[in-house]
């Protein structure tokens, strides 16, 4: 019987509220399946860790995360720690670096069909949107040299190596998990930037060599940003892009489903091809929202769907992943929702409903 070790970083403010509901789902899976054991370890990260230890990430917590099979994260940060020399985000950046999570995966779709009415886009524009953004996390301008040249001028540099691009591109293999395979989009600014020309050249060569059966299309980032508002279904499939462009385009995509409380993400340390262990950090894309924490009104769906991603990418448990998604869909369609998507249910009521529905689906 496989035993999976999961480190839980509940984090700050409403982080513990949403991870509590995600853990309910994990417990249902363990109860309903004889061939899986889940060992959960609670550790502090971010502001909670600063308050307890004066350190946003202790050596003990880091070691546990690196040795785990997966990490479940709630949310970190808040104005309480925002201007200090020691900040919550330092802990998160450190754990990502030490775990080697060089790629981030963010899906953009509707967890339930009726949620289309909550999108800021017209239903005729956004209905059927379903793409995944794969963002390179460890290269580019965020990790380049910074220089203050004069009092009125500064400079940031964007370095990218072929090796970094070669490492992220094979994640497009996720397109092969569908029949027929999904199209793959690579976003860059090759008409202006030298790094983007290297990006396009490398992506083209890697895709032709390793995935000749997949269709790859190149799109300029500014054009893609326009398409995402005008006709986002055109981008359905797998989107691969650099750190800066991925940061911006994934935030643009996040508004399509209508609430940040609906969208999960995964930062992975390898290629989830079933050939080896792939640790990852699974978390909702929203922040810690101190203004509504503790009121029982936050949406736990993104945290619950992060567990579905964990089941699929770190554990290779596709049936359980699809069951979680179906449970969420059924509960939302039944009208059990938090206020951000037109309902009146509390955080725990949504979590309880999803757990109960999942238990029925797994019988």
Swiss-Prot record:
<keyword id="KW-0560">Oxidoreductase</keyword>
<feature type="binding site">
    <location>
        <position position="106"/>
    </location>
    <ligand>
        <name>substrate</name>
    </ligand>
</feature>
<keyword id="KW-0432">Leucine biosynthesis</keyword>
<keyword id="KW-0028">Amino-acid biosynthesis</keyword>
<dbReference type="GO" id="GO:0005829">
    <property type="term" value="C:cytosol"/>
</dbReference>
<feature type="site" description="Important for catalysis">
    <location>
        <position position="189"/>
    </location>
</feature>
<feature type="binding site">
    <location>
        <position position="222"/>
    </location>
    <ligand>
        <name>Mg(2+)</name>
    </ligand>
</feature>
<keyword id="KW-0479">Metal-binding</keyword>
<feature type="binding site">
    <location>
        <position position="251"/>
    </location>
    <ligand>
        <name>Mg(2+)</name>
    </ligand>
</feature>
<dbReference type="InterPro" id="IPR004429">
    <property type="entry name" value="Isopropylmalate_DH"/>
</dbReference>
<dbReference type="GO" id="GO:0003862">
    <property type="term" value="F:3-isopropylmalate dehydrogenase activity"/>
</dbReference>
<feature type="binding site">
    <location>
        <position position="135"/>
    </location>
    <ligand>
        <name>substrate</name>
    </ligand>
</feature>
<feature type="binding site">
    <location>
        <position position="96"/>
    </location>
    <ligand>
        <name>substrate</name>
    </ligand>
</feature>
<comment type="subunit">
    <text>Homodimer.</text>
</comment>
<keyword id="KW-0963">Cytoplasm</keyword>
<dbReference type="GO" id="GO:0000287">
    <property type="term" value="F:magnesium ion binding"/>
</dbReference>
<keyword id="KW-0520">NAD</keyword>
<feature type="binding site">
    <location>
        <begin position="287"/>
        <end position="299"/>
    </location>
    <ligand>
        <name>NAD(+)</name>
    </ligand>
</feature>
<dbReference type="InterPro" id="IPR019818">
    <property type="entry name" value="IsoCit/isopropylmalate_DH_CS"/>
</dbReference>
<keyword id="KW-0464">Manganese</keyword>
<comment type="similarity">
    <text>Belongs to the isocitrate and isopropylmalate dehydrogenases family.</text>
</comment>
<dbReference type="GO" id="GO:0051287">
    <property type="term" value="F:NAD binding"/>
</dbReference>
<feature type="binding site">
    <location>
        <position position="247"/>
    </location>
    <ligand>
        <name>Mg(2+)</name>
    </ligand>
</feature>
<keyword id="KW-0100">Branched-chain amino acid biosynthesis</keyword>
<feature type="binding site">
    <location>
        <begin position="78"/>
        <end position="89"/>
    </location>
    <ligand>
        <name>NAD(+)</name>
    </ligand>
</feature>
<dbReference type="GO" id="GO:0009098">
    <property type="term" value="P:L-leucine biosynthetic process"/>
</dbReference>
<feature type="binding site">
    <location>
        <position position="222"/>
    </location>
    <ligand>
        <name>substrate</name>
    </ligand>
</feature>
<protein>
    <recommendedName>
        <fullName>3-isopropylmalate dehydrogenase A</fullName>
        <ecNumber>1.1.1.85</ecNumber>
    </recommendedName>
</protein>
<comment type="pathway">
    <text>Amino-acid biosynthesis; L-leucine biosynthesis; L-leucine from 3-methyl-2-oxobutanoate: step 3/4.</text>
</comment>
<comment type="function">
    <text>Catalyzes the oxidation of 3-carboxy-2-hydroxy-4-methylpentanoate (3-isopropylmalate) to 3-carboxy-4-methyl-2-oxopentanoate. The product decarboxylates to 4-methyl-2 oxopentanoate.</text>
</comment>
<dbReference type="InterPro" id="IPR024084">
    <property type="entry name" value="IsoPropMal-DH-like_dom"/>
</dbReference>
<keyword id="KW-0460">Magnesium</keyword>
<dbReference type="Pfam" id="PF00180">
    <property type="entry name" value="Iso_dh"/>
</dbReference>
<feature type="site" description="Important for catalysis">
    <location>
        <position position="142"/>
    </location>
</feature>
């Amino acid at each position: 019987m496989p035993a999976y070790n999961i480190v839980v970083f509940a984090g700050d403010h409403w982080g513990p509220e949403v991870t509590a509901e995600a853990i309910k789902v994990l417990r249902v899976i363990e109860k309903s399946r004889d061939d899986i054991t889940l060992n959960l370890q609670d550790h502090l990260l971010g502001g909670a860790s600063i308050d307890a230890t004066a350190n946003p990430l202790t050596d003990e917590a880091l070691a546990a995360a690196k040795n785990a099979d997966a990490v479940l994260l709630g949310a970190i940060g808040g104005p309480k720690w925002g201007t200090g020399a020691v900040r919550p985000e330092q802990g998160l950046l450190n754990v990502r670096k030490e775990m080697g999570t060089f790629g981030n995966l963010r899906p953009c779709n509707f967890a339930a069909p009726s949620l289309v009415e909550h999108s800021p886009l017209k239903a005729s524009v956004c209905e059927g949107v379903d793409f995944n953004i794969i963002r390179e996390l460890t290269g580019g301008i965020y990790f380049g040299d910074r220089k203050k040249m004069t009092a009125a001028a500064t400079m940031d540099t964007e370095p990218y190596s072929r090796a970094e691009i070669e490492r992220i591109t094979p994640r497009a293999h996720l397109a092969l998990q569908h029949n027929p395979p999904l199209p793959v989009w690579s976003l860059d600014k090759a008409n202006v930037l030298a790094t983007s020309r290297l990006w396009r050249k490398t992506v083209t060569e890697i895709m032709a060599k390793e995935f000749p059966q997949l269709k790859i299309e190149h799109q300029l980032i500014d054009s893609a940003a326009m398409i995402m508002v005008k006709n986002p279904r055109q981008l359905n499939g797998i989107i691969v892009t650099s750190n800066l462009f991925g940061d911006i385009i994934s935030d643009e995509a996040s508004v399509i489903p209508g609430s940040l409380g609906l969208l999960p993400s995964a930062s992975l340390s390898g290629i989830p091809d079933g050939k080896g262990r792939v640790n990852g950090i699974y978390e909702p894309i929203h922040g810690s929202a101190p203004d509504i924490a503790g009121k029982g009104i936050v949406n736990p769906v993104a945290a619950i769907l992060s567990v579905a991603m964990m089941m699929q990418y770190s554990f290779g448990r596709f049936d359980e992943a699809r069951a979680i998604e179906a449970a969420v869909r059924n509960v939302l369609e039944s009208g059990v929702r938090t206020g951000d998507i037109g309902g009146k249910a509390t955080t725990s009521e949504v979590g309880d409903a999803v757990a109960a529905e999942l238990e029925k689906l797994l019988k």
